């Protein structure tokens, strides 16, 4: 490993190390918002609602591909960080090689089992009429690019795992930048419409994956792309998948709960959907910053879980304090200028009032949401597979019964408050799991929870 990477893992001031690992991840998570709207933005110029619907309907498929990337990326990435903390550099080469080629194989399987059934999958996603063929065509490109999409997510995680978060950010920036260039060329220049949008995203993922591969081949002595080293054993598979499977489940369940919430809101009409949509876009930015903060320090926690548990404790304290500061600043902003913030999106006073109310409730859950993110990341980093699995399931399962109960008792207001209640229960569950696992973590987590 490079001396600079070891410095941030082992010796730099805790806050400096936290920002070194987290800042690129924060920027990356914010870029993901841009990434998600690029295709719709360019397709919007064609003024064809069927094309916009086709792209929107494919989002669950992208979430699944991202989840498959996390299966190897998060699972192997946290394991690699722990191996580096234990100075077991040779084993990390075997882990990385197996995960890279395992991810590619998984992508090829996706092509085989989905490509022949793209029309049927489009129909399952809700495509009808003119939208069906457009959605199917978009899906075909997505399925064909699956190996590279999965590989991109794996390699991006590996860059952070070895202490090179800036490389991770550069890869994401390159992918988004190339997509911005390619989309208008393919959509308008070659008149490919939704297929052009899909190709722009696919080519961007291929380019980013190749960037990471070239970087690791030239600069890393702990991540290997040598297929001869892709030899798994029982211990390796256990360490990868006990964390990778919960990460995969979390990606899938988060998308599912979002779908369920939309169904509840749809019951109250466009007024409710529009109000929530505005508040969601406003709360999304601080939420993504906190998510980037918590995910960014996962390699730092994993490394010091093996190398220096006192430093690991200091990192967790620093993250909790940072989450608290972000929460206080956001709450002050919402309760002082929240009405004006919502007014930037609409002049409809009824929607402004409802969206402002929703914004206050959802922003109030930011602290608890952050604690949940941090402790889930901590369980992943330290290899606590059972705890991570329980948290992944709870984050998807808790909100559904809460939504049904609150909707039955209080209607739309209950649906809105269910978000805060569910986040509170998830945060309490995370604290309880970490407390119960305190002996395995060998760090005084009870002090963190009480303090």
UniProtKB/Swiss-Prot annotation:
Location comes to: Cell membrane
Q: Could you tell me the superkingdom of the organism this chain comes from? A: Bacteria
Q: Which GO terms describe its biological process?
A: response to antibiotic
Its Gene Ontology cellular component terms are: plasma membrane
Supply the alphabetized keyword list.
Answer: Antibiotic resistance, Cell membrane, Membrane, Transmembrane, Transmembrane helix, Transport
Picking any one GO molecular function of the record gives: xenobiotic transmembrane transporter activity
Q: Which InterPro entries match?
A: MATE_fam (IPR002528), MATE_MepA-like (IPR045070), MATE_MepA_subfamily (IPR051327), MdtK-like (IPR048279)
Parts of the chain that traverse the membrane: 26-46, 54-74, 97-117, 139-159, 170-190, 194-214, 245-265, 282-302, 318-338, 355-375, 397-417, 418-438
> What triggers or suppresses the expression of this protein?
Repressed by MepR.
Keyword Cell division included in the entry's annotation: no
Q: Specify whether Transmembrane is a keyword of the entry.
A: yes
Q: Which residues form the signal peptide?
A: none
Report membrane topology.
Multi-pass membrane protein
Q: Which family does it belong to?
A: Belongs to the multi antimicrobial extrusion (MATE) (TC 2.A.66.1) family. MepA subfamily.
Q: What does this protein do?
A: Multidrug resistance efflux protein. Contributes to resistance to the glycylcycline antibiotic tigecycline.
For this entry, the protein name equals Multidrug export protein MepA
